[in-house]
Amino acid sequence: MAGRTAFIPGPLRAHPAWTAVAAAGAVAAVATAAVLTVSGAGRAGASHRGAHARLAASTCSGPTGAAYVSDSGWDGFSAIDTATCQVIQTYNVGDTQVPGDPGDYNYSSTNEGIAVSGGNLYFADTGTSNVAVIATSSLDPSNYNPPEQLINVGMFPQDVAVTPDGKQVWVAETGPQTSPSSPSGVSVISTASDKVTAHLPVGGQPSQVAFSPSGAIAYVVTADGLWLLRTATEKPVGVIHGLGDPHGIVVSPDGSTLYVTDTQAGTVAVINAATRAVTHTIRVGQLPWQMAISPNGQTLYVANPDSDSVSVIDTAANRVTHTVSITGDPDTLALTPNGQQLWIGQSTAAFVTVLDTATDTTVGSINLGGPTPQSGDGYEPTGIALVSTPTAGS
């Protein structure tokens, strides 16, 4: 399919406002922590076409909290202080120790999507067909190999998404295109036990999962179209076809509208969630991948890696109002809960750029600490999870 990559295979530094987090998708909050947003899987192995214009120094000033950025190049994730845009540490994920040699590891993992629930980070490890679970409370900047639990799922997991109530993680698995013994589908993980409770067959090569605000319906993007499943029964209730080469999905905050990217046509389909009909088609850039929607639902952001740009869409008018140039194959997006900052992962620049959405100016430029992917063992950001602690009175 066009635009897809087939894969064969102690606490953080003291910060009074960093705490555990809750469900994904900026829907739920637990205890004193709040999720800002969680992005899905980026594109591992994307081709490099340009250098990133780096800032001499970061001018970032964002919400107090942490960003966790998964990457498929170095096979780990970076923990970032969102208030300063400084990388605290970059950690390994899914790399198992070689028996008898405590200093050597099998570097076979390839991390894609990331999700957060109940103080745990969940990583889709495409290279090992596992979901890696790491407690944020266990992260220690002096140790880049944090303790983790590996949950075996279907082959080639691409995306992880947490239900609004935080009780389940749904895993989109592309699977081999021809293998009846390991079909593509969705694995459901209980966050209480961190065990797989179900495997749900859906259309071929599922790429992303999203939920209605109530959590009643799961939307799974596949090569065959958009599958709708009732989460209570884990049974399909419909499929929306005719979406071209779909990849990314977001749901409007009120649940009334679905947005799905078509990577081949360079468009976004606008779908009425009640009637399941496509009401508009919006042309954006080349290979539209991930999206993010503002908290009020009025603005949609679309990452176009093959155009080195982000399209900004007025959802009331269903049209692109302007385009922001971002070099380095931008394909991963995450918005802060107030919508004031857009975090953009650049898969071939080993950078995350932070935009002020009011002015579309760069307020932070974060070097993930390694070379670009083209120089070998480099960083390729594929997912961003932003978490923060509410301020007093919020």
Q: Model-derived features: where do they sit?
A:
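N-terminal export and membrane-targeting signals
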Residues: R4-A26
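Predominantly soluble domains enriched in secretory-pathway, periplasmic, or organellar proteins
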Residues: H15-P16, A29-S394
